[in-house]
């Protein structure tokens, strides 16, 4: 077995100590950063306790090393060279053991704990549990934030929690242990030396107390501006087609530059605060080292301490000077991580506005009866979109929602899916208030094809089977054939050479045309075979020949199912059982196509304005 494989096998044993997939989904994550950090630390308390011990040992070994060095110098001064090993070999062996065995064992153990046990698994544990909470947020949550910004908070939050704990338990605890032992050793040599270090520590603590809060404030602002800037970058790249079509690259320059400038200004305030702290620490350290050197030399000149004691004292304070510099950097990192965690909790620790009710039922396959009972709804604090809306859809009935843009058609569908909760009234599915049904089993009853197909950057196979995981290859292909997608799927390839059903479609399906994306979405709905179908301009991106062929399959698919169709092209829904005409969130007409045309109302006006199947929006003056 090669050395590399042996090393891999030895280290891999430590990587499974922390289970990153622990299920704590029922817990409510704390909103305050410190409580948030402790919540996750408790899930890996064993490794963190060992890290605390290792950090203390590291500080103790460092202090013992300098003390031993001073003792060794005194030993050399008092011993004839030819008698050194004969008389003092146990002491020399002990010193070598301390330097090469004990210190190495502590450092290697700390490295294994940090890099093999904690970093990969614990960081992933935080990110996984954060993702589990965020993915349960309602649709409105994602409408109010950048997707890239949310993803950044999950990634950075996981790293910040881990780094914060490691920093405290290993680096800072080791530093504090070293200070206490240094103070103890120096007091034993000369109390004045201990007084100098004690005063130095008070000054160091004062810098942390009075100067670091500015770093904390600047760090929090920097984290906010970093997230905003990252969100602007993702927004520009996600909508690159719009950027190209409107030739708005220079406008995006200004938009992104503004975000970068705000981040740069926040970062500059942070670095100014850091520079001030570093200057103060360097002045304090210089004063400490000068005072210790002067007192140690004076004490030696008076016969109070030995040469070895001077070496030990100076070695300890030089090490303290070295540690305090990078310790201030670590404390700064600690504050940055705390600010990052606090920023992340504002997203990750938000209790979902829509949750399953206690004791919510899991609905099996529904009959498809929907009842909107005096429903009122508005987005946020805005104007009511739906007001006192009532509609009964019988099982197996095919209904179309018709009306001008902004009438509330898509909102009605979103309320049925419980993407939003009604403000007043209720919605019943098979006699059950949808708020009393688990969200998962509620949405399992619906097959949806929207005007803008929702595809993942995964394989075509995965996208078709998204609503029915575990579907066989034959079932996936059959659904694709019914959606008239099989032929073009076979010709699709991606930059990594994957072809056909294995090809990845790009972010939001960007590698496919609008018609191809819509056919894959229809195939997904066909495969899911839900009892209620929602068709929101389901064939709007298709050419006439393909649309006609798919309409035949959709007609067959609709048999025995409840259908809610939304269409601006009235010709696509004229044959449905009942047309519901909506205007400003209210039902103004309902009936068959023939009945509504004969009535001469709003539907008849819309029908007359059709030109090539397109429904023009009503003029504001009408």
Task: Identify the residue ranges that each predicted region occupies.
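Loop segments that connect adjacent transmembrane helices in multi-pass transporters
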Residues: 145-148, 221-269, 341-343, 347, ...
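Transmembrane helix-loop-helix hairpins at lipid-water interfaces of multipass membrane proteins
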Residues: 48-106, 187-194, 294, 303-307
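Membrane-integrated ABC transporters
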Residues: 1-62, 77-95, 110-118, 132, ...
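Hydrophobic alpha-helical transmembrane segments of ABC transporter permease domains
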Residues: 53, 65, 118, 155-199, ...
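ABC-type nucleotide-binding domain
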Residues: 363-622
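Cytosolic ends of transmembrane helices, especially the final helix of ABC transmembrane type-1 domains
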Residues: 248, 272, 319-347
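Juxtamembrane loop-to-helix connectors within ABC transporter transmembrane domains
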Residues: 33, 41, 110-115, 119, ...
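Conserved catalytic Walker-motif region of ABC-type ATPase nucleotide-binding domains
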Residues: 134, 256, 372-374
